[in-house]
Swiss-Prot record:
This is Exodeoxyribonuclease 7 large subunit. The keyword Plastid does not apply. NCBIfam families: xseA. It catalyses: Exonucleolytic cleavage in either 5'- to 3'- or 3'- to 5'-direction to yield nucleoside 5'-phosphates. Bidirectionally degrades single-stranded DNA into large acid-insoluble oligonucleotides, which are then degraded further into small acid-soluble oligonucleotides. Belongs to the XseA family. It comes from the Bacteria. Pfam families: Exonuc_VII_L (PF02601), tRNA_anti_2 (PF13742). The gene is xseA. CDD domains: ExoVII_LU_OBF. Heterooligomer composed of large and small subunits. InterPro entries: Exonuc_VII_L, Exonuc_VII_lsu_C, OB-fold_nuc-bd_dom. GO terms for biological process: DNA catabolic process. It is an enzyme of class 3 (hydrolase).
Length: 444
C-alpha cells in the first residue's frame, strides 16, 4: 500500500499539513494495535497529568505518550531504566515531524523489574502497617463460606470437593478473573461485596484462591488495591494463591495463608468424622464421671441414713434419761420440803423461842430450795444444750437435706436401692424419692 501511494503521488505537490496527515494515516492504518518492549528513558510528566518518555533499545528510540486516564491505571511508579511492555497504536505528531506510540496499556517486563516493583511496594505498604493488623480468628464451624476465584478450572472444584468431603457447609461463590488487567479490581470488589452483604447472607470466612503460575500470572494478587481490601475486611480471609512456594502481597494482609486452595478448604472446616469421634469421647468421659459422682453421693446418703438412725436412737435415750432425772429431782425436792416442814412442826412444839427457830429454819429452807432449784436448772440446761447440739449434728447429716440439693434416691419395686444402670437393668417399677415426695415410675 505504501509503495502504491508513493508511485501514485510521486509528482504531486503536497502542503506540509497534507503530507503530515498522509503519513499519520499510513502509520495508523498499516500498523494498527501493537506491543513493544523496551526501557523507559527521558520520562517527563506534564502539569496536565500526561506522561511523555522514550522507549529505547540499544541506540533505537521510540517516542511514547501516556495520557492521564491511562497513567492513572498503571499500578506501579514509572521511572527511567524500567523495562516495560507497552500496548498501543502508532501515530505521528505533525508539530515536530515525528511518529510516536500512544500508550493503552503498560506492564513491567522481565523478572528483575517486577521484583523491584514488588519489593518497593511491599516496603511501602509494610511501613503503612497493612501487614501488621490484628488477625481475625477463623471460625471453628462456619455456617457459610465465601469463595472468590475463577468459576472455571480445577481450583473451585477442588475447594468444593474438599469442603463437602470434610464437613458439608453452604458455599457462596463470587466468580472473578484471576489474571489480567482488571482482575485485581474484580477481586477487591468481591471482598468488599461480601463485607457489604446483609448479616443473614454474609459468609463467616472468605477464601481467595488461584492455582499456580509464574510471577506474571500471579501479579494481580500483588496489587495495592487488593491488599487494602483484604486489610479492611471485617470477615476473616484465607489466601490460597498459587503453590506453597508462591508468595504474594495478599498473603501478608490476609488473616491466614494457605499453601494451596485445597489446604484453604481444610483450614475452613474440620473433619466431621473426627469431630464426631471427639464428641463421643467427651460424652463417654462425662457419663463415666457422672456415674462415679452419683455412686459417691449414693454411698454418702446411705452412710448419712445410718448415722441418722444411730443419732435418733441416741437422742431418744438421752431424752428419756433427762426426763427421768427431772422426775427424780422433783421427787427429791418434794421430799426435802416435806422433811423441812416436819422439822418446823417439831420445832414449833418445843416452845423454845419458836419465832427465832422458825425464822432460822425458813431461811435455811429458802437457801436449800434455791440451791436445789439452781442445781436442777443447770442440769436441765446442760441436757438441753447437748440435746440441741446433737439435733444440729443430726440435721446436718440428714439425707433429706441432701435430697433438697437436687439429688434423688432410686429404689426398686421391693425397696432395694438402685445405685447404677446395671442394677436397674432388670427392674420394671421404680420408686424415686425427692425432697418433696416420692413418685413411682413404670418402664415401658
Amino acid at each position: 500500500m505504501l509503495e502504491n501511494f508513493i508511485a501514485n503521488q510521486a509528482t504531486k505537490e503536497f502542503s506540509v499539513s497534507e503530507i503530515s496527515n498522509k503519513i499519520k494515516e499510513l502509520l495508523e492504518n498499516n500498523f494498527g494495535y501493537i506491543k513493544v518492549k523496551g526501557e523507559i528513558s527521558g520520562l517527563k510528566i506534564a502539569s496536565s497529568g500526561h506522561a511523555y518518555f522514550n522507549l529505547k533499545e540499544n541506540t533505537a528510540i521510540l517516542a511514547c505518550t501516556c495520557w492521564r486516564p491511562i497513567l492513572a491505571k498503571i499500578k506501579f511508579p514509572l521511572n527511567d531504566g524500567i523495562e516495560v511492555v507497552i500496548s498501543g497504536k502508532l501515530s505521528s505528531y505533525a508539530g515536530n515531524s515525528r511518529y510516536q506510540l500512544s500508550v493503552d496499556n503498560l506492564q513491567p517486563a522481565g523478572l528483575g523489574a517486577m521484583l523491584q516493583i514488588l519489593n518497593d511496594r511491599k516496603a511501602r505498604l509494610e511501613k503503612e502497617g497493612l501487614f501488621n493488623k490484628i488477625r481475625i480468628p477463623i471460625p471453628f464451624l462456619p455456617d457459610k463460606i465465601g469463595v472468590i476465584t475463577s468459576i472455571t478450572g480445577a481450583v473451585i472444584k477442588d475447594i468444593i470437593h474438599r469442603i463437602r468431603e470434610r464437613f458439608p457447609t453452604r458455599i457462596i461463590i463470587w466468580p472473578v478473573s484471576v489474571q489480567g488487567e482488571n482482575s485485581s479490581n474484580e477481586i477487591a470488589e468481591a471482598i468488599e461485596g461480601f463485607n457489604n452483604l446483609a448479616e443473614v447472607n454474609k459468609p463467616s470466612v472468605i477464601i481467595v484462591a488461584r492455582g499456580g503460575g509464574s510471577i506474571e500470572d500471579l501479579w494481580s494478587f500483588n496489587d495495592e488495591i487488593l491488599v487494602r481490601a483484604a486489610y479492611n475486611s471485617k470477615i476473616p480471609i484465607i489466601s490460597a494463591v498459587g503453590h506453597e512456594v508462591d508468595y504474594t502481597l495478599i498473603d501478608l494482609a490476609a488473616d491466614k495463608r494457605a499453601p494451596t486452595p485445597t489446604a484453604a478448604a481444610e483450614f475452613a472446616v474440620p473433619v466431621r468424622s473426627i469431630l464426631n469421634n471427639t464428641l463421643h469421647s467427651y460424652e463417654k468421659i462425662l457419663l463415666n464421671n457422672t456415674s462415679r459422682l452419683i455412686k459417691y453421693h449414693e454411698h454418702n446418703i446411705i452412710n448419712y441414713d445410718k448415722i441418722h438412725r444411730y443419732l435418733s436412737h441416741y437422742m431418744d435415750n438421752r431424752q428419756q434419761l433427762l426426763d427421768e432425772t427431772g422426775f427424780n429431782l422433783l421427787d427429791a425436792l418434794l421430799c426435802f420440803i416435806e422433811l423441812q416442814e416436819t422439822k418446823i412442826k417439831s420445832f414449833s412444839k418445843e416452845r423454845v423461842n419458836p419465832a427465832k427457830i422458825l425464822n432460822y429454819k425458813t431461811l435455811e429452807l429458802t437457801h436449800q430450795t434455791a440451791y436445789l432449784s439452781k442445781s436442777a436448772n443447770n442440769t436441765l440446761k446442760n441436757f438441753e444444750y447437748k440435746l440441741e447440739l446433737n439435733s444440729t449434728l443430726l440435721a446436718s447429716l440428714d439425707y433429706n437435706n441432701v435430697l433438697k440439693r437436687g439429688f434423688a434416691i432410686v429404689k426398686g419395686e421391693t425397696g432395694n436401692f438402685l445405685s447404677s444402670k446395671i442394677a436397674a437393668a432388670n427392674e420394671k417399677i421404680f420408686n424415686i424419692k425427692f425432697s418433696d415426695g416420692e413418685i413411682k415410675v413404670v418402664r415401658n
